[in-house]
Swiss-Prot record:
It is found in: Cell inner membrane. Its EC number is 3.6.5.n1. One of its GO terms (cellular component) is plasma membrane. The keyword Membrane applies. GTP binds at residues 19-24, 136-139. It comes from Coxiella burnetii (strain RSA 493 / Nine Mile phase I). This is Elongation factor 4.
Length: 602
């Protein structure tokens, strides 16, 4: 296949909220440009993971190269990079945008603009991309294109009066959209003769090939068999295979400046080609690496432990392979008295955490226990040193703490006026402080400062229920703020269970302690002796309940006779139970650890 001239290449991605029809539009592009035969087409071609197809969301960014014949008679090479729409995967979006010159802003004509789309669109504009507004789902009876155009102009602030109207489901307007795209989005720039600079947008591990990297060539030309160098590690490899996805893997002889494609260089080390790194030639290397992506900081932390302790090694390998494919996942070894050895993992949000756990269980056949998620707290010790704690059991003694500061997030919410009251009530309940309220044409834009610990747990779900699914949310960490926080310990039979400890606000500690002990009472199986469940702040017990003992009727064999005979048997039973209580261990089921998560949802 001959290398196409740079002026006929267009690199673009699609910005859209969940359910606005992004993956369906991608399917139409592939169909129209003949990327796959009719027999090979299936709905959501690019959502390759089972989880993506089941949940109807895009998690990983995918890339496709298509050939499009325009009305002007020229063939254009369209490199399309699909992006996720959920707030937890926003870092995937910024990586995709770094490889493009333009973006299609797809808005559902019936639903209008969502908060998430606004945030991603600003990222694209900041990176200097040309943004092309597109109205999708115009075939729906409730579609209101005029209102959607007004919202794009009011909320995002870009011209949208000539936005292209399409119905991805029916294929209407898709050809016109591609024609417009070829004209509006500029071709890539970069000298094919310069020293090679290729940005790694994504990497994944293939058990046969090793590390496969998705790259955007910014300058120079990469040929098959070239000796290439990964700039951050300084290690050299040979480019065994290069090519692009149509969406099938298609080998090529070279990728020159402006192209997007994959490289297989026989890298067996999982961390051999980190995302955001630069590839260059080993002999004529580029002077400096390309600016990568800003490192994403995990927001939610939880302990993951294998149920079977023999699975610790396979679990570690699985995490390493997943980390290659998911740059935002962070992990470090951790041991718990209750759960044994495992890892403390950092995620971007609750959906990210669920997806990671589900991928580990499905793709690597592991059985895992998750502890309650927490956020990272800033602690000023009395000696003046600053600590960051993301695990409640690592919190210093109350006497050594000068001040605990919790992370505060700025949440931007877009909601129809009808549900404004319910959403404000929810924000107040979550200890939110209103910063801004703005009435737009058909929606209200609200800005709140809410503690991150409240946002990451169940705020998104609660917001959706409060607004019947109409509200949309975008949040980002802003700063740390001093708060009256305490560590809530759970004691079972007088023993602290480290995996059940949580950090809560003092005002909520009593209610939370009572709810937790009640919930655990239902989940811990009854023993031959009474099991006390207590919630404590430091040495002070704030709630207590107990699991009653199973009772064996030892006096059943006594018919009539002396009362002292019965008393003797009862005393003997009592002494046995007391002895049992001292040595007896209580097995805590997996549901009990999850109870900590669920108390908040009710």
């Amino acid at each position: 296949m001959t290398t196409i001239s740079q002026k006929f290449i267009r690199n673009f991605s699609i910005i859209a909220h969940i359910d606005h029809g992004k993956s369906t539009l991608a399917d139409r592009f592939i169909q129209l440009c003949g990327g796959l035969s009719e027999r090979e087409m299936k709905a959501q071609v690019l959502d390759s993971m089972d989880i993506e197809r089941e949940r109807g969301i895009t998690i990983k960014a995918q890339s496709v190269t298509l050939n499009f014949k325009s009305q002007d008679g020229h063939f254009y090479q369209l490199n399309f990079i699909d992006t996720p729409g959920h707030v937890d995967f926003s870092y995937e979006v910024s990586r995709s945008l770094a490889a493009c010159e333009g973006a299609l802003l797809v808005v559902d004509a019936a639903q209008g603009v969502e908060a998430q789309t606004v945030a991603t669109c600003y990222t694209a504009i900041e990176q200097g991309l040309v943004v092309l507004p597109v109205l999708n789902k115009i075939d729906l009876p409730q579609a209101d294109p005029e209102r959607a155009i007004q919202e794009i102009e009011d909320v995002i602030g870009i011209e949208a009066h000539d936005a292209i109207r399409v119905s991805a489901k029916e294929g209407r307007g898709v050809k016109e959209l591609l024609e417009q795209l070829v004209v509006a989005i500029p071709p890539p720039v970069g000298d094919p003769e310069a020293p090679l600079q290729a940005l790694i947008i994504d990497s994944w591990f293939d058990s046969y090939l090793g590390v496969v990297s998705l790259v955007r060539v910014k300058a120079g030309t990469l040929r098959k068999g070239d000796k290439i160098r990964v700039m951050s590690t300084g290690k050299d490899y040979y480019a065994d295979q290069i090519g692009h996805f149509t969406p099938k893997r298609q080998p090529l002889e070279e990728l020159s400046a402006g192209a997007v494609g994959f490289v297989v260089a026989g890298i067996k080390d999982i961390f051999g080609a980190p995302v955001g790194d630069t590839l260059t030639h080993a002999k004529q290397s580029a002077g400096s690496p390309l600016p990568g992506f800003k490192q994403v900081k995990p927001q939610v932390f939880a302990g993951l432990f294998p149920i079977n302790s023999e699975e610790y090694e396979p679990f570690r390998e699985a995490l390493a392979k997943l980390r290659l494919n998911d740059a935002a996942l962070f992990y470090e070894p951790e041991s718990s008295e209750a759960l044994g050895f495992g890892f403390r993992c950092g995620f971007l949000g609750m959906l990210h955490m669920e997806i990671v756990q589900e991928r580990l269980e499905r793709e690597y056949n592991l059985e895992l226990i998750t502890t309650a998620p927490t956020v990272s707290y800033e602690i000023l010790a009395k000696q003046g040193e600053m600590l960051y704690v993301d695990n409640p059991s690592h919190l210093p003694e109350p006497g050594k703490i000068g001040e605990i500061r919790e992370p505060i997030a700025v949440a931007n919410i877009l909601v129809p006026p009808t549900y404004l009251g319910a959403v404000i009530t929810l924000c107040v309940e979550k200890r939110g402080v209103q910063k801004k309220l703005l009435y737009l044409s058909n929606q209200v834009s609200m800005t709140y400062e809410i503690p991150l610990s409240e946002v990451v747990l169940d705020f998104f779900d609660r917001l959706k229920s409060a607004s019947r699914g109409y509200a949309s949310l975008d949040y980002s960490f802003n700063h740390f703020q001093a708060a009256d926080l305490v560590k809530l310990d759970i004691l079972i039979s007088g023993q602290k269970v480290d995996a059940l400890a949580t950090i809560v606000h003092r005002d909520l500690a009593y209610t939370r302690g009572r709810e937790l002990t009640e919930r655990l009472k239902d989940l811990i199986p009854r023993q031959m002796f009474e099991v006390a469940i207590q919630a404590a702040i430091g040495a002070k017990i704030i709630a207590r309940t107990s699991v009653k003992a199973l009772r064996k009727n030892v006096t059943a064999k006594c018919y009539g006779g002396d009362i002292t005979r019965k008393r003797k048997l009862l005393e003997k039973q009592k002494a046995g139970k007391k002895r049992m209580k001292q040595v007896g261990k209580v097995a805590i089921p997996q549901e009990a650890f999850l109870a900590v998560l669920r108390v908040k949802n009710e």
